[in-house]
Amino acid sequence: MPDPMRSYLDFEKPVAELDSKIDELRALAASGSDISEEISSIEEKAAQALKDLYANLTPWQKTQVARHPQRPHFSDFVKGLITEFTPLAGDRKFGEDEALIGGFGRFRGESICVIGQEKGATTESRLKHNFGMARPEGYRKAVRLMDMADRFDIPVLSLVDSAGAYPGIGAEERGQAEAIARSTDACLSLGVANIAVIIGEGGSGGAIAIATANRVLMLEHAIYSVISPEAASSILWRDSSKAQEAATNMKITAQDLLRFGVIDAILKEPAGGAHRDPAAVIALTGDAIAGALNDLRNLDRDSLRQQRRQKFIDIGRKLG
């Protein structure tokens, strides 16, 4: 059987079958049979099949990969990249929102403010973090942290992974749209460097509220869009089953967005996606963040602010 801890997507069935065969042969080898050459041969086939498959993913398949339950989340990146991380809670107006986590720590020896959505990895944690869908108090907490970072001249890192801001009645009553707008404005107004990395789903205003940054990086199989493919197909065709078609037409992949100038760089994932080798992806992401911060190091506060604002004005003019 394939690794019981590994979750395969529907389109990965050929790879799952090869992995299953490898496990069967390994079980035979453990009983004394000398079949190492056969195992090696099938392992090579499985690796090549995975490489070929992921080299030609459709936008809808990338959407599935971006949502993979074993994909590294905000907390994994923080554990792998940030030392002495101290989370801060509450918006000082209503309460705490655990869908959006933020705090201060050290990145490669230097102080940094980190904010981002956490989806959770288990049923209990997903409920605790509301599947990464932040409420108004989450975005107001982000504004509070960005204000602190700006005051103490500490760069800001945003790790984006959310299907979107929470659309519940309570969230709307507490000013969800206003909170998103103020968070977006806080990003644009920072006098310190800020880097955003789309690590999974970058959904709508819930994503851009913390992603209007000097540099926007995106993992190879992440997605970034104004609306989910399912919702778009329901609106455009009154049929959610057309999500695959919507995903293609919406241009939500890193490759499309780099071509349009919406993002600045694509971070390579291993064959099979980030969930196949989280440690490697996290390390590569750390190097990219360090490089981006270094590029911005010599810019003064006004230049950082102007570069960021002009970046998004140019996107609007180009794509508007």
Curated annotation (Swiss-Prot):
SUPFAM superfamilies assigned: ClpP/crotonase
GO molecular function: acetyl-CoA carboxylase activity; ATP binding; carboxyl- or carbamoyltransferase activity
GO term, biological process aspect, one: malonyl-CoA biosynthetic process
InterPro entries, sorted: Acetyl_CoA_COase_a_su, ClpP/crotonase-like_dom_sf, COA_CT_C
Superkingdom classification of source: Bacteria
Pfam families for this protein: ACCA
Localisation: Cytoplasm
Domain CoA carboxyltransferase C-terminal: start-end pairs: 41-295
Pathway(s) where this gene product acts: Lipid metabolism; malonyl-CoA biosynthesis; malonyl-CoA from acetyl-CoA: step 1/1
Gene3D superfamilies according to UniProt: 2-enoyl-CoA Hydratase, Chain A, domain 1
EC number: 2.1.3.15
Name by which UniProt lists this protein: Acetyl-coenzyme A carboxylase carboxyl transferase subunit alpha
Organism, as annotated: Nitrobacter winogradskyi (strain ATCC 25391 / DSM 10237 / CIP 104748 / NCIMB 11846 / Nb-255)
Lineage: Bacteria, Pseudomonadati, Pseudomonadota, Alphaproteobacteria, Hyphomicrobiales
